[in-house]
Amino acid sequence: MASPLTVDERRRWLYSLKQSPALRHTRASVLLRLLERARPVEPQPGEVICREGEPVDGVYLLRSGEWRVTAGGTVLLHLRPGMSLGVEALARGTWPVAVTAESASCALFLPRAELEAVAAVPRPGGFGGGVASRADVVTFRARGLELPPATVSLLVELVAKVMVHDFGDRVLLVRAGTKRSEGAVRGADGVFRRTVTPHAPVLPEGEDFDCVLLDGVPAPEGLTPREVWLVPPGGEPDAVGTPGAQVLPTVLLSPWRPQGSRTLLGRSLPDEDGWDEDVPPPGCRLRLDWERWVVRPGDARPLAALGLDAGTRDALSRWARAITGRRVGLALSGGGVWGFYHVHLLRRLAALDVPVDLLSSASMGSLVGAYYCGTARDGREGLDGLRRLQHRARGGHLSAAALSSVVTTQAMEWLVRGDLGDLALEELPVGFLPVTTDLTTGRCVVLEKGPLALAVRASGSAPGVWAPTLQPPARYVDGAFTSMVPVDVLLHAGADLVFSSNIFPAGHHHAARPLLPGAVGLFLSALNPLARAKDLLASGVLLLHRNGDLESARGDLRYDVGTRDQPLLGSMRFTHVDEVLDEAARDMGLEQKLLELKQAWEALRTRGSTSGGRRAA
């Protein structure tokens, strides 16, 4: 049996697949799921992999061994572990070369049919499924949670309405009953409903749906459904699901009962040559007051007629996006005052009606993310928090906190807690995932639970300048040093559309002219300790920026701020916030990227224009 893909293999082959013209615009999350389902092949020495002129059968990803590539009998090159075969040939249709195994080898094979389906039909694979022409079948159950069956039925009823309203999906809701309905009946809310008796077929003949929601009905035999588990805060599911089924744990949060952890908890990202072991499946949070609802299961009124408050409506939309594979994730880099580019970005996304379901960040990006996610609750868009952060920067409060952090980073923690209160990461409806660096292990740590203000402090403790954040045995410093733009964090968390923003500029380094002419002047100039210190700073800035660029490439869309004069010195001028916001507003490159994100979101929301009649009328 083939071993799991290492982190380095996932990254390398995701990048390789993105180079294919046919797959260039395919979402990274879909390609990652294809990689997880790739079929292992083990060619023996002398075995022919493909012949010149034959139809391309798929893409091969070599894990071990060596393959010989020839054209017209001439050896062109040898493929070695980590290299791919067939990525560029997909668009051509036939193999331009012949490939033979030189030694016993192991590879992964992605069939052409699956790759073409991904490229031709922009249909999301949900939270771990694949691309399939049939409807997505979803089951619901409570795990480790005392929840009346009527409440589960009501949640299923409401999320079905939201899927129809928000996405235009054809949704079938199937419930158990004593009498079987022959076909599916469409209600005033656009949801198709059907009642089935035990052992009766679940799906009606001759009907096509985007999603089938099973409420108290077992999945048809031979079909592996997706399972939505309703779990309590801080609790783990107390049972295993259907073998092979993809699971979406949904944490039910009450707006009236804070249940956050007081201890900062995180998970280390795996090493390059390792893989994720015992990592729970990506989940989501459902923050709503279900105990006070007056809606009942079977209510076929349109969504607008139910009188749901803004918080409930927002929570159900987030849940619907998680179930159907439509979650949008943002990865925000660090960069001091340049982080207010992120503020402009978030404001524009709100104006463009692009949702944000997951947000990963480092350093200053975590401060912006905290003020956004900490106030994007109960139907609010998070813009109030961004205004408060802008006010803090303009009034000099951020500069004072940054200066105090030379002694202790508690100053930044106090500032955030004073503005946002005692919120915890696991209480936020928007999945907020700041990263930090643990110097005791050298690993990047994704902070998932604990005080929000403390997480911001740990993510932005720039080493050598600011004091570290000590959470024994961990010694946390700035997350930008191990993950400047945390795109991988979003992919692991279940984001389906990823936008990354690298706003830490690369700098222009102007070399000083030698004071003396000739070789002596050059020698003295190279010996200058002040010039060497400037070289060190410029190299550090360039290294951080380039690392951010490499991570950004694994997302679906990305923005890079480019170069600026004295970026490191300028990043500490927090009182210049209005100048940075004005510059961001004038940046047509950023605006173009945001419009592309809007277009990508609309394609994801409506499943594209090639739906083949699957959309609701």
Predicted regions located by residue number:
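Glycine-rich phosphate-binding P-loop
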Residues: 136-165
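Cyclic nucleotide-binding regulatory domains
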Residues: 22, 43-104
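Helix-rich "cap/lid" substructures immediately adjacent to catalytic or cofactor-binding pockets
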Residues: 307-359, 616
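Inter-motif core of Ras-like GTPase G domains
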Residues: 219-235, 240-249
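Extreme N-terminal, non-catalytic leader segments
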Residues: 106, 111-139, 299-326
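Non-catalytic peripheral regions of patatin-like phospholipases
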Residues: 254-303, 307-313, 328, 377-419, ...
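P-loop/Walker-type NTP enzyme "switch/lid" segment
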Residues: 141-145, 170-211, 216-222, 435, ...
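Cyclic nucleotide-binding regulatory module and flanking cytosolic helices
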Residues: 1-45, 89-91, 114-124
